Amino acid sequence: STVDAEMRYGLKYVEEQEILFGDGTGAHLEGIMPQASKYKAAFEVAMQNGIDDLRLAMLQAQLARFPATGHVLHFIDWAKIELIKDTLGRYILANPAALTGPTLWGLPVVATESSAFLGKFLTGAFSAGAQLFDREEANVVISTENADDFEKNMISIRCEERVALAVKRPEAFV
């Protein structure tokens, strides 16, 4: 149903925010970003740009003994990278006719709409550095027996899941 789909979509959005940015207080997860290592380039690159930053973040993770497996970027930042052109106006990375998924330096890129990611990135060894425990998958429950819903001719809808996040190796993320 539409209600079920909307509730699950909203829950997944909140889950993404918690996994990435949760502050660990109360019922909040302790997200990856607050625990990640601060980006520190091992060396400077001439005319350094976002593409260079992501490669240097991969190096930083590698030097911490956790080879990166992916990047997370805001939609706008990823579009800026894809639209970089050479002096002849040719796209450096993107091939508008290609049907391949987004990748950079051989790693998948996950673009997010989270406004907190604008101008930032997360590069890391996602499979080795963190683990998501999913105790209860998303479920939607509809009830008329909540408090006085029956008398008021109302229904209550709840969508929830139970997850925990263990960032076992914070140094695996930059």
Which residues make up each language-model segment?
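Structured, hydrophobic secondary-structure cores that serve as assembly/anchoring elements
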Residues: 1-174
